[in-house]
């Protein structure tokens, strides 16, 4: 594109002279919104086609504009468009290059449209696409977790509360917890997409236009569900952007949780898992190191995602109706957030899908019964003892076990009976982890049948998603 910094920007038609270079430097946004070129061109093609159908623009001119915009899109994609700060934003860059290709016909394009409703459409189109990309990445992540869960139905490990051993669960149940989280994330992205998929074009700067536009036709051409209903709101609404970044932030928080577990589980102290070499890094100094950078970066990226959300909300706070230039600053958090999530999700999917989980070490970590103390309390409850009384009795047994230096599973039947008269010899059966799991078959529980039911449910759900 031929740069022409002396040409007066279209927004200065009523102003004398040129803008001060300091204002130009502050105002330029092409370095950020240039990433929206595909959405901007797509919206322009739908808009000019509608203008022609409504008799506002000659059909031949509209056809030339649509064809030329295809060329502009290709030039952007190939990196052949040189950004000119004097042209400020992506809209002006597209229109200027269009003018070089079709001459005065380019002047038809902006009829009935403002950059205010134009950029609102660009962002909505971006959000719809971003939701689809995030959903696809999260589905890939779910499949990675589901594959490992299916392979580890019989692997038992301690479940943790407060990072202290609590009760036994299967590794499949543990991994399915993340499948659930990512399922909720996908639902959120679907909701964001649904609300974003309406067209603001026709809202103009803030009060529509006197031209007989067909707003619904533009929405239909773009594959959107309908149109916005208030022009003031439409040009200043960034709710969908905020919702998208919230969905990204919460998904990133979920990724940070598995990231933390990958870091912990791959330590010698835990020894629950080993990352494949393809998803580990070394040290520039210590040749023996195998570092879980993928988990650490997942934790770190969550901080960035939270920052993007807070940055956008701070920009929106206190803005009067309708459009304000503050909204130019929404591009950096909006455009970077979804792509960072996709990148992180794919890396974590690869790390989890290729990791080795050490079943023997996990089962060793259950210890000799402490994680099954609740089963002993419920043993009494099944015999008519109030739970608080049962809880106190087992607590005394746990304290005695610690003082004696003997695991609870090694206490004698007589010792158990000393803590409560309803304890009998068969209380020792409570300290069999596999038996314990088999007795936990409520829906959503870690029992083998319950876990298999959840595996089948998710396999069916993801199978439908693939089709």
Curated annotation (Swiss-Prot):
This is Argininosuccinate lyase. The keyword Heme does not apply. One of its GO terms (cellular component) is cytosol. Belongs to the lyase 1 family. Argininosuccinate lyase subfamily. Pathway: Amino-acid biosynthesis; L-arginine biosynthesis; L-arginine from L-ornithine and carbamoyl phosphate: step 3/3. GO terms for biological process: arginine biosynthetic process via ornithine; L-arginine biosynthetic process. It comes from Anaeromyxobacter dehalogenans (strain 2CP-C). SUPFAM superfamilies: L-aspartase-like. Its EC number is 4.3.2.1. Keywords: Amino-acid biosynthesis, Arginine biosynthesis, Cytoplasm, Lyase. The keyword Lyase applies. GO terms for molecular function: argininosuccinate lyase activity. The gene is argH.
